[in-house]
Amino acid sequence: MEMHPWLPNLKYTEEMLKEIGVNDIMNLFSDVPQDLILKRKLNIPYDKPLSEYEISQRLNELKKKNLELKYPPFIGGGLCPHYIPEAVKFIMSRSEFYTAYTPYQPEISQGLLQAIYEYQSLMAELLEMEFVNASMYDWASAIAEAVLMAHRINRRKSVLLPSNMNPYHREVVKTWVYGKGIRITELPTDSTSGQIDIEKLEQINTDDVSAIYIQQPNFYGIFEENIEYIVDFAKKKNIITIMGVSPLSLGLIKPPGEYGIDIAVGDGQEIGLPLNYGGPLMGIFAVRWDSQLVRQMPGRIVGLTKDEKGNRAFTLILQTREQFTRREKATSNITTNETLMAIGSAVYLSLLGKHGLRDLAEEIYVRSHYAKKKFEELGFKSPYSGEFFEEFVIQFPKNYNLIHSSLLNKRIHGGLQLNDYCALFCFTEVHTRVMIDELVKSIAEVL
């Protein structure tokens, strides 16, 4: 009987091995160390394949081992819990948007293209930047792309990254710039304020510096107060400025465009996206109006034009700068984007509105400051004096590992451990005063 060519069988295997001159299939793995090769059958604890119902039962048993938290997590580090309106979830789940399709054919993609265009427009208004792309993977890859973009423009071989930026983002940037031979110079943090040390910045040799990155607020949740000075310092030396921002904080503080920032990046997680093992995330990428910046900008851009009949039409524009051209000429090889997530963020911002954004930012500010006050009442202080938003660091007299374990026993997820005695906490609109009070009380009981 003729076997289907897609189904593996001994006859076809032997023919393929003979064709490539190999006697045994294991010879194909000769470069793999022998101690890494599994030479026994898989230890599957069932004597027969399970039915769908049996698998469902088994998965439910495993699920019961998970720790069900009493409250939303208080762990900081850039990804914090926020309330997502049901309308956002509903619109994102519609089949018109819930697709992996890339809208290369504008004539059949007007609805999807318009949704992306609306996201770009909303984000441009929020950031006060003229051009926003259709999104990136996440904040970390957006920073990496910004650094590579700056290098393409001025051909310099060094980038300034502050020590108070998200350390996980720094690792991603380090990976991406390695192949280009771009050096990373660290900007020290002032030990008192938690902000970039301006005096140390002025001492750095900037002759070969391509770009400087600022995170606002920084990894410790602290607002950088010297951004105007840093931007002026950079422009005098023809250094490209990159700012990473928390979208919700823009309800209270100046947007990047108002500072004259060249490239703005961030993450859309806090504006309408759920937390799920580090994803799904959505990188924000924007530039000010400058033809060189726009031409070197990575990612897709949706533009508005007219068709041959004079009707409004949406289409992908400036495609020669992206991966539609030869690989070595493309502005980005990280590629793709997070269109569905971008649409979710657009819906979220539309529902929130300008006043709603400010109200939400104020609520987060008030709740996080209430939490810090409760910590201070019990003698727990932050090592930094700078003004903060949503997140802050607390130093404890005992090893934080003991505190965190005790909290987990009470089904409370505490802060992100930074060292033996410090942890980074976050407080948002989903954390009530009752929750905050119990967190602080539970920590005090351990100490």
Swiss-Prot record:
Q: Which Gene3D superfamilies match?
A: Aspartate Aminotransferase, domain 1, Type I PLP-dependent aspartate aminotransferase-like (Major domain)
Question: What InterPro entries does this protein map onto?
Answer: GcvPA (IPR023010), GDC-P_N (IPR049315), GDC_P (IPR020581), PyrdxlP-dep_Trfase (IPR015424), PyrdxlP-dep_Trfase_major (IPR015421), PyrdxlP-dep_Trfase_small (IPR015422)
Q: What is its EC number?
A: 1.4.4.2
Q: Does the keyword Oxidoreductase apply?
A: yes
Q: Which residues form a coiled coil?
A: none
Cite the entry's keywords alphabetically: Oxidoreductase
Reaction(s) catalysed by this chain's protein? N(6)-[(R)-lipoyl]-L-lysyl-[glycine-cleavage complex H protein] + glycine + H(+) = N(6)-[(R)-S(8)-aminomethyldihydrolipoyl]-L-lysyl-[glycine-cleavage complex H protein] + CO2
Q: Which Pfam families does this entry report, sorted A to Z?
A: GDC-P (PF02347)
Q: Which GO terms describe its biological process?
A: glycine decarboxylation via glycine cleavage system; nucleoside metabolic process
Any one GO MF term held by the record is:
glycine dehydrogenase (decarboxylating) activity
UniProt family annotation: Belongs to the GcvP family. N-terminal subunit subfamily.
Subunit architecture? The glycine cleavage system is composed of four proteins: P, T, L and H. In this organism, the P 'protein' is a heterodimer of two subunits.
The task this protein performs is described as: The glycine cleavage system catalyzes the degradation of glycine. The P protein binds the alpha-amino group of glycine through its pyridoxal phosphate cofactor; CO(2) is released and the remaining methylamine moiety is then transferred to the lipoamide cofactor of the H protein.
What's the protein called, per UniProt? Probable glycine dehydrogenase (decarboxylating) subunit 1
What species was this sequence derived from?
Sulfolobus acidocaldarius (strain ATCC 33909 / DSM 639 / JCM 8929 / NBRC 15157 / NCIMB 11770)
Query: Lineage of the native species?
Result: Archaea, Thermoproteota, Thermoprotei, Sulfolobales, Sulfolobaceae
